[in-house]
Amino acid sequence: MSDPQSDPKWPRSILIYSSSAAGGMPHYAHYQAQELARRGIAVTMLCRPDHPWAASPTRYTMLRGLPVPPVGRGLVAKALRVWCHIWGHFVLLGAIMQMRPSAVLFEENTEYFAAIWAWPHILLRWLGLPYIINLHDPVRALWFGPRWFGRLSLWAAYRVLKGGLIHGEPPAGAYLPRWMVTEIVPHGLFGHMAEREPPFDLRERLGIAPDAFVLLSFGHITDRKNQHLLVEAMAQVPGAVLVIAGPQPSTRQRGAAFYRQQAAALGCADRVHVIDRFIPDDEAAACFAAADAAALTYDRTFVSQSGVLQLAAQWNRPVLASGGDGPLRAAVEGSGIGIFVEPDSTAAIVSGLQSLMASPPPDPARFAAFRESASWEANVDGMLRLLRRVKGLG
């Protein structure tokens, strides 16, 4: 580990722990790594073999040593997923001891079962290794196992950390212990998706009329996105079509069959399309090219940022959004690239959707300004400021 007090170019090396392979998190970590490496910092990403950038040329080094958790509902599969999560942090420990990086970055919150894996990392932090994290969701309310174990895991995981990158002012209920230093940074753009040519016309494939208004709900199918309220809204807004596109990460939440049955019961099955699988990048381009607007209708507990907002901005697509007070609301209302409505309300969604359908699209200059502000350069500037702050250098 290099000594920042005697090294004006500190940090010279950063080890990124990227344990996910789906959704926006691995892309977020990739773009951070690319920008760090562009500045001459030696970056190694510890990731899974199925990381979405594993087969692509990168400016940084990929160490594909994390275990791949199995899929399935059985007890054995669940136990193996827990083991993979815990073991991954010991793989990280081995990589640290071998590489001796200047700092470690976690791609996202990783406190689950930290009561088991955190202790050697706490020791390394105490010995001077700075650990920082991307605080995509600073409100932590999900527990695994007994509540005491969950609270201990949360405390232990945050004891590893010295600082975090956050997308706005900490929302109400954020878990930020007194020792945590934070730095506000923008959520950068996933530019590789916008560079893809759509491989097909999604409207044509789904049989959607050219004059229909297509509302796209993109990404993981989860209850907190209020997609059932979007289906209810379709029944009340003739001329609107809903496309839900993304995988279902949990069988404990409403899935594709639920939304199809709901749409059939409400008489709008011909205007609700559910594509319940992982959407490759080129098909993501087809989804946004076909859409007139994107739905980010989170429930009131959501106080984070959404990578789908950045995707919508790249295609100049306005958003219909909801949620609690947090970075998503600030971004939508501050940029003027969409409408933010009351969360958890079908009536509010209907009103917002009708407003989008009746109004001309936002000025393209607003999208351009939003894209200009959502830069990875600014994100990494903030990361380096944070690292120097936690080392007492800035």
Whereabouts are the PLM-identified features?
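N-terminal strand-loop element at the rim of the active site
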Residues: 9-10, 18-23, 27, 34-88, ...
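A charged, aromatic-enriched C-terminal amphipathic alpha-helix characteristic of glycosyltransferases
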Residues: 24, 344, 358-390
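A short helix/loop element that forms part of the nucleotide-sugar donor recognition site in Leloir-type
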Residues: 194-208, 259-261, 364
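Conserved donor-binding/catalytic core segment of Leloir-type glycosyltransferases
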Residues: 209-225, 231-234, 242-245
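Nucleotide-activated donor-binding/catalytic signature segment of Leloir-type glycosyltransferases, i.e.
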Residues: 256-279
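Acidic donor-binding loop of glycosyltransferase active sites
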Residues: 286-303, 317
